[in-house]
Amino acid sequence: MPGMYRNSMRHHDSTFSLRSRFVALAVGAAAVLAVVSVPAAAEPASSGGLRWEACPAEYELDPASDQCASVAVPRNYAEPDGGTIDVLVTRHRAEDPGSRTGVLFTNPGGPGGDAIGSNRMFVDVLPAAVRAQWDVIGVQPRGLPYAGALSCVMGPEHAMAAGFGFGGAAARAACESDAPGAAAHLTTENTARDWEQVRVALGEESIDIYGLSYGTVLGSTYATLFPDSTGRMVLDSAVDPTWLWNEVLWQQNEGYKGRFNDLMGWIAANNATYGLGETALKVYQRWSDRIVAEAGGNPTIAPPPAQVGDVPPGLEALADAYRSGVDLAGPVRVQFEAFIRGLADPSHTQMSSSIYLMTRQVLPARNSWPLMARVIRDGVEAIPGGGIGGMTEQELERVAQTQMMQSVVMCNENSVAARPDRIPGWLFSTFVTEDLFELLGYSYSAGAFCAGAAPVASLPALSNRGLATAPLVLQGLRDPQTPYLGGAQLAHDMGAHLVTVDGGDHGAGIQGGNAVIDQAVAEYLQTGRTAITHAPEAPIIAPL
């Protein structure tokens, strides 16, 4: 998409394979947020001191309803006279101007989520009453395109460091190679202070907030710094601030494994539709076969527990012993098979499989599970766009640039000490199995990812002091991306009203089709309270 990355990342041809591995890690780690790409043709309007006009064309936003403007903010708030950056802001006008209540700031998570395109996603899924009464506002996080985008020059040494697992140090060095110190201002607190500058530019006395995932940390940071300017705040899929950042990825490991078993079980329960097997273990084998066919290497995540339907005919009397033996041998078997395949050909690795990378991506969003089942049944050709192998060079650079910015922020403000006892697990998962369900957590927790990129800032202690209205937290019980206990902790820290949501969807309020959640969000934003404390899992509304 021309123009989106004006300061694009450059690379040396000899480092392409290692850079591609970095991109594969980024793709595999990405949360599915279903951001809507949406054309922009102008008709400028001005209000609140800002000049509203068509958004950049790549966002494909209709200027009749969605416009953009830029706000100049200090590059360094500790040195306000030290220069500024222009931060792009998008606005979707309240659909019933006569009942307009105020502004609702949104953030899709990350760090590194694009707030311009995602703002339209929020508009599309928010309850109609909210769309009618609020201007929905997206503020592009600093460091991304149209907000002081970093120029990250990935040389051979940076690509090598990233390929070997030291992504944080590689990102910081690559993004500071042209301008030493340029990455130090990329912090959650500075982005929250950018929100305050935008509030003032809009001429609003206060803002309401809808923060998703990392956006719950950003929103809570704003509320802590500017309680008098904070109205009502929805924190969807929240994060324990004491986990930032090494512990967040570690906590995700077990959640993703559990949610993987949920996916296998769901496909088995829908065997009449997909024909992939009536047990989770049989579905797993079909999934594994597809990955081997695509990449030559088999997955190493442990197979799901065996069920009665997995016991061969004639062994029913020994079913319990058989199942116990299969469960005991399964993890060792798949790792041994992957090791042997790798010896035969080192290029045969699960990380080369688009199906494997896609699997981890879809786990937090059940509406993507029907597509995943079709991909397992029909092969990689069923992946829209052809998967990572079908990505253009520009798309690969876009993913890598987003991952660069995320890495910089996370290492800039990491507050969790490294666990040297987890170094063996990091080495094994990174250099032997290349198992995404293990290596991301081990890489951060062991201290490898941010090694050589020491923190330069810290978050303020998050609190509800001075807030007129208690926040609302929506938290999924089996959400692998932001585990439930972390959300409950942030709810405690912020004195929030907690709504527990069944299932494991990440972003309870953005999945669509959950009338109870829609009611809770609308009631809360309109009145400042809701009596709802529990919501069912959202139905799958995607076609099977």
Task: Label every model-predicted segment.
Residues 2-28, 35-160, 514-544:
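Catalytic-loop region of hydrolases
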Residues 192-206:
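Conserved acidic catalytic loop of the alpha/beta-hydrolase fold
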Residues 204-214:
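Alpha/beta-hydrolase fold nucleophile elbow
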Residues 223-286:
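A catalytic-pocket lid/entrance helix-loop region that shapes and gates access to the active site
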Residues 287-462:
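Alpha/beta-hydrolase fold active-site neighborhood
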Residues 466-467, 472-475:
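Short beta-strand/loop motif that positions the catalytic acidic residue
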Residues 480-485:
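Conserved alpha/beta-hydrolase "acid-adjacent" motif
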Residues 505-515:
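Catalytic histidine-centered segment of alpha/beta-hydrolase-like enzymes
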